[in-house]
Amino acid sequence: MFKELIWVKENSLTEQFCKSVIDKFETDPYRKPGEVDQNNPRIDKDLKVTIDATITHNISWREEDDVLYKALGKGLYEYEIYLQDISLGKWNLHPSDGYRVKDTGYMIQKYEPNGFYNWHHDWCMSEGWSRIYTYIWYMNTVKEEDGGWTEFIDGTKIQPKVGSILLFPATWTYV
């Protein structure tokens, strides 16, 4: 059942959009070494080696933020339909107060060769909401022989393909 909850949809974003995001990111003055722990942000190269830029609330990224918001809404909707299909209606995935999404913003992360983000989970609870899904968009394609992939604790590996979105539960079982 573990693998079934990991879902990839190709062409969630266009290749042209992804290229423009990469180009803009490369010149963004707010890029910085990746930090861990949103409650106590710090650089810890034993846990994460990335270059990050948070684009939400940055006026120069407003158009991209809007595209990502719409694509995420569509992706979440399709993912939940997929989950209902594989569960044969056994799971109720909609919260009792209806389908609401809290947009917590978007961060672009660049992994240089040998960069990584160590095993972790993304579940959190804050201000009356819970994060239940994690999503990753791939802005570029990485060949398997080049060693870039997203790997789960059960050994499942997802190969990055430009424009694809990856969705999975944010809980500890999907580190």
Task: Give the ranges of each region predicted by the language model.
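Fe(II)/2-oxoglutarate oxygenase catalytic core
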Residues: 1-166, 171-175
